[in-house]
Amino acid sequence: MLNGRCTVTSLTMHTLLPISNAANRERGSATVTALIVVGVAAVLLAGLMWRQQIQIRTLENARDQVQAQWLQRAAIDFARLVLVEDQRNSQIDHLGEAWALPLADGKVADFLKNTDVPDEIAAVTLQGQLIDAQSQFNLANLWDKSFKTINPPGVQEYGRLLDALGLDKNLAQQTAQGVLQLDMPIYDLEGLLKLPSYSPAILEQIRPFVTILPVLTTVNVNTASAEVLMAAIPGLSRSAAGAFVQQRAATPLKSADEITTLLNKMGASQGITLDASLVDVRSQFWLARSEIRMGRGLFVSSALIQRSQNPLPSGNFTQVIWSKTGKVLAD
């Protein structure tokens, strides 16, 4: 009996062990399967959340872009109002006038204290400035009004500017000829890079001193830098140009005739041949620049405004030639 029971027990153990191992394997497989399912679900959920976040960010960016454009329009309208008011009060343009004061970085809410505006708009910051476009050399002066032939006085003026900047003055003639050969007008300074004579380094060197306007223009001697004055007034030395800038700050010139008077007063008129067609004390083109910080982005805007002494076809005294807004920073 004892041997029989031992035999039965031994057989039972040998029979149960394989069953227990099979159950463990099944439980292990179930655990692995569950982990895989959880992992896949987590990946899918993360993907959905990421796509949702992308969609939300895209909508926010689109909203900010539209709001920034509206704020830019408001800033441009304000700039036009300032320019019209300036023309009513003064027949000359100089850096001591209200238009030349930069708009300090401030919140939109500060400008709309008595207006109920949404919190996200009230927190937006804005800064801007008006720049006299005729304080720079206008590259459009390199050609005649029809843009078919080279304008020699404009080429000579640009050559003097390049020389004042330490660049090859022959680049002026190369520019005038090169653009005509391309038979494609340039609308921004980056267009100069299509010419083999220009490099990004040269472009950055001339950028503060040149612009491109839709028509031939004069240089405003009340706002131009010393380098641009050296270009617009043949024979003007660098030291005389610097002294000219200091003198006009105290007493802005009221007419082109006063240019010669000031040069004589400074003792700097010798060797100077003044071309009245190149200079003036008034301007008609202005660059309005603004920076709008909204949400995660910084929107940089610029616009070219033309002001006329007589009403334009629209009936207004100012008009926007072009405007653009770009998002340059995102957190």
Feature-to-residue mapping (PLM):
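Compositionally biased linear targeting/interaction segments
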Residues: T9-S10, H14-L17, S29-D331
